[in-house]
Amino acid sequence: MRVSDARPLMGVAWTITVYAGDRHAGDAAIAAGFAEARRLEQVLSDYDADSELSRLSAAAPTPQPVPVGDDLWRLLVRAEEIRGLTDGAFDITVGPLTTLWRQSRRSGKLPRPDKLAAARAAVGGDALRLDPKLRGVSLRRPGMRLDPGGIGMGYAADRVLAVLAALGIDSAMVDASGDVVVSAPPPGTAGWRIAVAGLPGDDAPDAKTLVLSQAAVTTSGDARQAVDIDGRRYSHIVDPRTGIGVSGPAAVTVIAADGATADALATAASVLGPDAAADVIDGVPGCSARFVWQAGDGIEHCTTAGWPAD
């Protein structure tokens, strides 16, 4: 029996859909899934000053490694792995820059050079150190702020799917406002049908509905979150290496084996652009991507080698 419910969590709409033996079992599983998402919000939120992540950021710089819980540790380990894969195009220490650009989007003015320099000084891979023996985290620079926005939603969706599986739900979809993870297909189908997001006017044959199982998919880009300042468009996604908001408009959809990977690689791909991002994505087993961007009055698009065929 198909059972589905939607609730606001982590500042966005979440939908959990399961196939269960009966409605009671489905409702119970979904309730457990939402409870897990709420628990993770208390760990990973960078808006809640009392979350574990926010308390860690507030302690920067930390003279000694700070022990953290399992979820924050796993998130940071994967974030550092993706940072290495992308040569810093994804960097969870980008928080000071995203905060600064959030203010710029509200004011309609570019960040002041001195403030941009100060924020950049608090960002970078060598600013974060992980101690596997202690499961401890060192934040080595003043003013650091961890930003889980490019990986946290995907990670949380993964953990919710794991909770559903532990309750005997073999076929489920968790949709965290576009960060989608799925397990086995619905009964009698080849997979879960998931629409690919893009840009207005994107009607190419590969802008379609995906059919996925045991996979995750995320779309990232500035199609809906951007600001025009001094005649130039800036995304909400900031390049951690330069401190500047990505210019667009563009969108990238990434398919991966898990939500955290899809989420982080989609963010990195928005920074890198199609060519450099394709080199990274082609090297990750189970990953593929579709890129779409505005080119004059038209829409251009391309896909990596592993993107599902029409």
Spans of model-derived segments:
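Mature catalytic core of soluble alpha/beta enzymes
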Residues: 1-310
